[in-house]
Amino acid sequence: MIARLHRVWWGLRQESSWGWRELATGRLRWQIDVIAYRAMAFPSVARYYKKHELDRFRVLKTKGGVTLYYRTNRGDIQGIREIFIDEIYRLPEHVKVTGLVDLGANIGLATVWLATTYGLTGVIAVEPLPENARLLRTNVRANNIACQVIEAAVGTTTGVTYFAETSESNLGHVADAGREIPLVDVREIVNELSFPRPLLKMDIEGMEGELLQSIDPVWTRKFVAMVMEMHPEIVNVGELVQIIRDQGFEYRESYEITKGYQRAKRERLFVRQEI
């Protein structure tokens, strides 16, 4: 019991989201959800949330005018913290983008943050799970973002595939068995881009290896920058980094920022060398 209480306390001290000053409405509800998220170390709390709260929608509004719809599962709460508070997708000032292709958009948190932060005029978001895609559409509509939502998994061919799901919303992945979902070839998406200076954001739970190694990675040259999460337990990160470098990108490795108890991480960034 003492060990669990210590983990909850330590987690809250690390939780930069606890004191999110940019919230205009929904702060108390958000703080309760953050406490519950950390308190799920206790089985009774986890059971209650799974039974009563897991799929309920919450609404937050920031002082900057952004509206976010989320659920009380781990993936949504953690995603808000990482993307809106820790700003893991913030780009260097010299990198100028006007559009976005978001592979693995989930409920649209990164889509919304990138589009509103950088004033993007062209946005494509790809998400395979219907329940996530519905909330993705809700979030982009709520923030007046012109976004084409593609409800499919991304791969190296077009057809159907299987998707293994989890209760945490952001950890599902393409698998040999599971829910049958549409599959779209990444090259079809890229070849139809109509906006200039696009950014690629990719978080597809290990499928990045297939997109970069199973087909010619020349498709990446369409982008002025790419920010992505790589999964070293699934892919060889060094090999993927070299593949992208060979396409003319400069690599900036992910790194961690520590401020007191708070820790934040920037994702791996690739910038075209001519920028």
Task: For each feature predicted by the language model, list its residue ranges.
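Phosphate/nucleotide-binding beta-alpha loop and adjacent structural elements of enzyme active sites
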Residues: 1-275
